Amino acid sequence: MGEPITGRLSADSGVKFVSASVGVDDDRFLIMNTGGYGYIAEYKNMISNKKSGRAFMRLPENAEMLKAIPVRKNHTHIAAVSNIGKLLIFEIDELPILGKGKGNKIINIPKDKLAAGEEFMAHAQLLATDSSLRIEVGKRFVTLKPKDWSEYIPVSYTHLTLPTKNE
């Protein structure tokens, strides 16, 4: 069932489709990549009337796009996590609204570690002021309520690390 997306779009060889989004002009989405960069985009700037699409995000070398996340009016914070357990929570207003570009650094990923595949931004989640964030690692998990977020919201814009099993 269904229709191949390549019937509607002409993509270069090796292009990987990561996400599909539906919205109206003023809807907003968090656009980000594994290199740790991202920005907020309005839906009207995400649309192309050309079959070949359009340049939308400049990727750092060796980075890949992550799934676009719809931004709702009640979302106030972004929680970003790397594959090695770094967690950063910050206010959504700290990210710019752009039509295209590289965006701002969401979480620090060293270029050499990204190139080697050792470290990358794995995921981000949008949070409302009454949200709880559940982080699962294997069979273990931790739930962070808003009162717990301050530990992961830096005074200066740098990343913090979750304690590991050995600490």
Each language-model region and where it sits:
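Short, structured "edge-of-domain" segments at secondary-structure transitions
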Residues: 1-167
